[in-house]
Amino acid sequence: WYSGMFAPNIKQEPISHHHHHHHAHHSYHQHPHDSNSNSNASSPHQSPLPSPNPPSNTNLQLEQYLKQQQQQQQQQQQQQQPMDTLCAAAMTPSSSNNDQNSPLMPPGLPNPMQSIMPANLRPSPTATTTTTPAAAAPTTTAATIALQANDKLQALTPPMDVTPPKSPAKSQQSCAEREKEHDLMSNSSEDMKYMA
């Protein structure tokens, strides 16, 4: 009955009309009977029609949506810090990268790379050192340059590949996606709880 009453109320603007109607019923003293038959008429008659349906539906969707919004906001607040740092970390490399390997070079990426790189490169200088100390100097410099170049490359390439262009987009997307998924998941479970 409520939604039957509510629907017309929302659907057609005649709130005043509704009011008036109500009033008329009241003065007629047929209010109970009339409103009953009225809501009955409007309900069955309208519920096949998309009248109370949308309102109740939209209300439901709205509720869900609102709940989702709230959840998202909460989630964003919770996730903001980790996510932000994550996205920021993913983002900064792109700028810091081009500034040549600034300290923010994603700790995750080149560090392993750097540790691998020197490891790979170290044998060669050492080997060279054993051969000729004289050659060692150039090699070392070469190695260092190679390392730097490599590092620059590393800084640019892998992150470029893995981090900057794709990553901020990707990690942000995944942030969003994770959020969305999370949201949907927690939402549905909450909804189930809610519905049940």
From Swiss-Prot:
Residues 176-196 have a biased composition (Basic and acidic residues). Residues 16-60, 90-196 are annotated as: Disordered. Keywords: Developmental protein, DNA-binding, Gap protein, Metal-binding, Nucleus, Repeat, Zinc, Zinc-finger. Its main location: nucleus. Residues 125-144 have a biased composition (Low complexity). Residues 92-103 have a biased composition (Polar residues). It comes from the Eukaryota. GO terms for biological process: segmentation. It is found in: Nucleus. Coiled coil: none annotated. One of its GO terms (cellular component) is nucleus. Residues 17-30 have a biased composition (Basic residues). The keyword Ribonucleoprotein does not apply. GO terms for molecular function: DNA binding; zinc ion binding. The keyword DNA-binding applies. Belongs to the hunchback C2H2-type zinc-finger protein family. Gap class segmentation protein that controls development of head structures. This is Protein hunchback. It comes from Drosophila silvestris. The gene is hb.
